[in-house]
Amino acid sequence: MDIIFRDQHLETAMVGGAMLNTAVSLGRLHMPAFLISEWGNDGVGEITQNFLTNNAVNTSFCKSYHGNTSLSVALIDTKGNASYTFYKNYPEKRFQIDTPDFEPGDFVLFGSFFSIDPGIRTQMTNILKQARNSGALLIYDPNFRKNHLASLEQLLPFIEENIRYSHIIRGSHEDFHYIYRVDSCQKLFEKVHSLGCEVLIITHGSDEILLFKECTKTRVAAAAVEAVSTIGAGDSFNAGLMYELYRRQISPNNLNMIPSCEWAEIVSVASSFAANTCSHYENYISQEFAQHILSSQAI
């Protein structure tokens, strides 16, 4: 749950979490979205469950534990950017879920601290191994926060293992600066490509988006928007990316066959998802925007 303040005043509260935000956007687009997660058996957990159900997100692989659901407090500045403080109270035994039966044609998005948390690393790697071995297409969003920098030395092996499992990495310029301290996007791609990454997408706020694959770099203008809040923008970008890849029937087998012009179309759609989310306080694309996308695809 995200509790959002602006100018030191409470603005709103939103069911949140990076993968949850993406799943809600996909659910609003009538996509078969499943969330793998956990939350407490408290009132906030009940709100979360009901919200996901109402937004067509399948929670078969979510479990509630005895305790409090995690909270984040977001302070929004004058540019709509947020700084976060997290409040977590996990049980001793965590992430006791059933692993999905992945199959070719599935897309698996994972990331944030949840994907590198030492407390659930074994369960996470088991899921990633099964997904990769089953022919699913894996997308990794590091979503690495500044407050985890003190633990980077411990966490970097997990980040790089996640990169090895992934077909596509999508992250912000800020994420990669925190992780690798490199300013050259080309050098960054060389690094992650050496670990097995096939496609790297770097977003940088309102600046152009860069997409790297072997021997090719594609530049795409970011969709313009007057930001109310940037919370969930990257998550909605991921939703747009997954929506377009799913719609175009992209798989690990044909990922490298996508021409640069088609990648530009895919990234432009993803950027429009992010822009829509920046235009309001919800962490996901609006219901109206989702209907617009669905209507335009039906033509």
Role assignments for model-derived ranges:
Residues 26, 172, 234:
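Short, conserved phosphate/pyrophosphate- and ester-handling motifs at nucleotide-, phospho-/glycolipid
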Residues 32-112, 293-299:
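Conserved N-terminal subdomain of the carbohydrate kinase-like
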Residues 104-105, 135, 166, 197:
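Short, well-ordered alpha-helix to beta-strand connector turns
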Residues 1-57:
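Glycine-rich phosphate/adenosyl-contacting loop at the front of the ribokinase-like
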Residues 129, 185-299:
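Conserved phosphate-binding/catalytic region of the ribokinase-like
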Residues 32, 137, 168, 198-199:
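Proline-centered loop/turn at the N-terminus of a beta-strand
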Residues 116-190, 208:
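Conserved beta-alpha-beta core of the PfkB/ribokinase-like small-molecule kinase fold
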Residues 101-103, 160-163, 194:
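A short, aliphatic-rich alpha-helical micro-motif
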